[in-house]
From Swiss-Prot:
Assembly notes: Homodimer.
GO terms, molecular function: metal ion binding; NAD binding; oxidoreductase activity
Record lineage: Bacteria, Pseudomonadati, Pseudomonadota, Alphaproteobacteria, Hyphomicrobiales
Residues the entry annotates as binding substrate: 123-124, 260, 269, 278
Enzyme class, first EC level, given as a word: oxidoreductase
Positions with a binding annotation for a divalent metal cation: 153, 197, 252
Pfam families associated with the record: PdxA
SUPFAM superfamilies xrefs: Isocitrate/Isopropylmalate dehydrogenase-like
Record's cofactor remark: Binds 1 divalent metal cation per subunit.
Protein name: Putative D-threonate 4-phosphate dehydrogenase
Protein task: Catalyzes the NAD-dependent oxidation and subsequent decarboxylation of D-threonate 4-phosphate to produce dihydroxyacetone phosphate (DHAP).
Gene it is expressed from: pdxA2
Signal sequence extent: none
Family: Belongs to the PdxA family. PdxA2 subfamily.
Amino acid sequence: MSKIIGITMGDPCGVGPEITVRSLAEMSAADREATRIYGNLATLEAAREALGLSVDLQPYVVDLTVEGAPLPWGSLSAVAGDAAFRFIERAVRDAEAGNIGCIVTAPINKEALNMAGHHYDGHTGMLRSLTGSSAAYMLLASERLKVIHVSTHVSLKEAIGRATTERVLATIRAGNAHLKRIGYEHPRIAVAGINPHCGENGLFGTEDDDQIGPAVAAAREEGIDVQGPISADTVFHRAYSGGFDLVVAQYHDQGHIPIKLVAFDTAVNVSVDLPIDRTSVDHGTAFDIAGKGIANHGNLNSAIAYARKLVAGQASRKAAS
């Protein structure tokens, strides 16, 4: 299995190119040799100039054509959306072929993506489609808090409908397997409720009793150390304080808000249950500051470090088999 990680530079008009260049510039020579950047060389060179850096880019870039590159920073366009898709598509194919061990994605713009005819709700849905996977889960990881989501980019109304026993159970299983993979021998998992105070015995909704509770019971029967549903207004604090290794959140904002509160610049977005490995920054394209050389690349550094751990784990498993 390849130890090379592949960074997709994201939307050419956003902060992705500059944070990618800055992260590459800070790498050791050995880490650079184990890195490929899927993007557009002219755009990356423009970002390098904006940053005032002198790092050599050409040896590490899989250079893909972008019409009119470099495009204006901070602009929304179908050209940029299509380019962002093609960067990811090429990286996925190389990952499937074993040429790279993990993909690290810089931010894309969903509106630009859809303008270009690529109708996905984000990276996770796109990767699920490109790999032909039936399921994929978004896990946000920080040093003291990790959260996996039952649903993500859907309306709150739809998210409630998606919190089925089957889907909650599948999310618990996926989270448990991932934590074991990264070194947790006996992961301790908490499942957040979806209603205030988990419905108060049906006073505020029955989903916790009828859908989420049975999923937790089934997971426990499988030997998974899981508790819940636990009221969402306390479960994240308990996990952050060391009581749990992972929280299963029922919908996007339930899981994202606590993570971004405690680890805004360092949290890593991980796609779980795909046939390939992928980590990502946990922020958007930030068009308002793109090209100004002020974007914080700490989040990307965290995603790169997590990817290298996953790649090292692949090598360890292969050696043991």
